[in-house]
Amino acid sequence: METYVNKLHEGSIYTAAVQYNVIEKDDDPASLTIWVPMFQSSISADMLIKELINVNILVRQISTPKGPSLKIMINSRSAVLAQMPSKFTISANVSLDERSKLAYDITTPCEIKACSLTCLKVKNMLTTVKDLTMKTFNPTHEIIALCEFENIMTSKRVVIPTFLRSINVKAKDLDSLENIATTEFKNAITNAKIIPYAGLVLVITVTDNKGAFKYIKPQSQFIVDLGAYLEKESIYYVTTNWKHTATKFSIKPIED
């Protein structure tokens, strides 16, 4: 079994982002990715990861208004995992590598192949794209972060465009948009890191919360869902070998 610990926060209390790679225990097993709803923990990461791999996982495919889903049940006798959600539902479209192999409405035990734990900042220091978009009244433009990574094994570079948030820009300020992108955002981001969670997510640390980032607390972490963007790459390979080198910004008008 493989285990990975990504420490993006060193505090005594942190938010745990846990992802399992599992395989069904049956004659025609399906491979699944399971991510646990984030939870707060004060247990050391090294101790927590040891308990995370000693759980029993049951999976059942169900139908929901949001599409095919998986009902997950995690059983553990460890008090260390008392804060971790034990029953939850995730998207089958993101989770399943081979959905045709998973039976409908049958509870199946799974074997853990890999477990990843990422330590993030506490809940009130985390922000998502959804959080910011909901706070924008009559949005006119979108802010796109062009995050550049270098593969340290091959020296090749890749740029991942990520939607950050929508903003409202008045007509009189349109001419200054280019200046905003080069000055206001210049020092906003100190680093970006790809971690395994719900597939893959990008964690951006924001240092300057002026202007377009005014709803984000300084030094908070901004979580961007990459979904299946890198589904053909090994999660372990990407998280280990991709180094963030730069971030540029683009401000685009919202298209009808």
From Swiss-Prot:
A motif (Nuclear export signal) lies at residues 194-206. It comes from the Viruses. The keyword Phosphoprotein applies. GO terms for cellular component: host cell cytoplasm; host cell nucleus; host cell plasma membrane; membrane; viral envelope. Phosphorylation is important for oligomerization. One of its GO terms (molecular function) is structural constituent of virion. It is found in: Virion; Host cytoplasm; Host nucleus; Host cell membrane. Residues 110-183 are annotated as: Nuclear targeting and binding to host importin KPNB1. Residues 1-110 are annotated as: Interaction with M2-1. It is a peripheral membrane protein. One of its GO terms (biological process) is virion assembly. Plays a crucial role in virus assembly into filaments and budding. Early in infection, localizes in the nucleus where it may inhibit host cell transcription. Later in infection, traffics to the cytoplasm through the action of host CRM1 to associate with inclusion bodies, the site of viral transcription and replication. During virus assembly and budding, acts as a bridge between the nucleocapsid and the lipid bilayer. Forms dimers. Forms higher-order oligomers. Interacts with glycoprotein G (via N-terminus). Interacts with protein M2-1; this interaction directs the matrix protein localization to cytoplasmic inclusions comprising viral proteins L, N, P, and M2-1 and mediates the matrix protein association with the nucleocapsid. Interacts with host KPNB1; this interaction mediates nuclear import of the matrix protein early during infection. This is Matrix protein. The gene is M.
